[in-house]
């Protein structure tokens, strides 16, 4: 039961950090390439 409580307390923290980092990455991409439908480094 203690392991379950540890898991339930760690999962929200890790998901918050993950989604925060993902949001920051998306914000920086949109800052560098505003309104980009196709990114220059993805065009072949």
From Swiss-Prot:
> Transmembrane region positions?
7-27
From the UniProt record, list the coiled-coil ranges: none
Into which family does the record put it? Belongs to the PsaJ family.
Q: Where does this chain mainly localize?
A: plastid
Q: Which UniProt keywords apply?
A: Chloroplast, Membrane, Photosynthesis, Photosystem I, Plastid, Thylakoid, Transmembrane, Transmembrane helix
Which topology term describes how it sits in the membrane? Single-pass membrane protein
State the compartments where it is located.
Plastid, Chloroplast thylakoid membrane
Q: Name one Pfam family in it.
A: PSI_PsaJ
| CC per GO annotation | chloroplast thylakoid membrane; photosystem I
Question: Know the name of this protein?
Answer: Photosystem I reaction center subunit IX
Q: What does this protein do?
A: May help in the organization of the PsaE and PsaF subunits.
- The gene name on file is psaJ
Entry annotated with the keyword Transmembrane: yes
The positions making up the signal sequence are none
Q: Which InterPro entries match?
A: PSI_PsaJ, PSI_PsaJ_sf
A biological process (GO) of this protein is: photosynthesis
């Amino acid at each position: 039961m203690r392991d379950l409580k540890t898991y339930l307390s760690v999962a929200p923290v890790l998901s918050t950090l993950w989604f925060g980092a993902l949001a920051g990455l998306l914000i920086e991409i949109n800052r560098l390439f505003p309104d980009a439908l196709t990114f220059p480094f993805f065009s072949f």
